Amino acid sequence: MISNADIQAAWIAKIKTTPTVTARVPAVEVREDQWKGERFTYPNIRVKLGLLTPTQPNSVCLVFRSEVAIRVYVEQKSSKTADEIAGIVATAFWSHPFSQGGVKFIAVNLTSIEPADVPEWDENSWLSTVNFTCLVSAA
């Protein structure tokens, strides 16, 4: 069984080593969505997991369906940068299988890109989200 924690850690590690992404967002600002540090530096990326579902309804299932949201935050007057970074993330990972940290991402399917919008908790920033559905197994 693959855990959500393993999948999230694999995504974070992979994003941190993807030059097209880290050219716009410092690797130290790529973290799990639940991170509760005291400093929130922009731009940043947070990795949020959705459902982890077995592809076969039995205890011997080796492939799972995983939902992941890559959330891009910026603090600027315009939403343009958030949308640009979201596009870079989508391009870097859509249909590009990878292995990281003991997890093999057999298929990485882009399900949507949410255009930048102002999050309800911070009127000075923008949030754009890239949503993927993946097939994963142990590497």
Regions of interest found by a model, annotated:
Residues 61, 75-94:
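Extracellular/virion structural assembly segments
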Residues 23, 91-139:
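Acidic-leaning, charged glycine-interspersed low-complexity segments
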Residues 1-60, 80, 96-106:
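Small/polar-rich, solvent-exposed N-terminal microdomains that initiate assembly or binding
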Residues 61-77, 125-137:
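Oligomerization/assembly interface segments of phage tail-like spikes and tubes
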Residues 43-45, 68, 108, 130:
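A broad, low-specificity signal marking well-ordered, structured residues that form hydrophobic/aromatic
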Residues 49-52, 64-69, 89-92:
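Short, low-complexity, polar/charged sequence segments that are solvent-exposed and flexible
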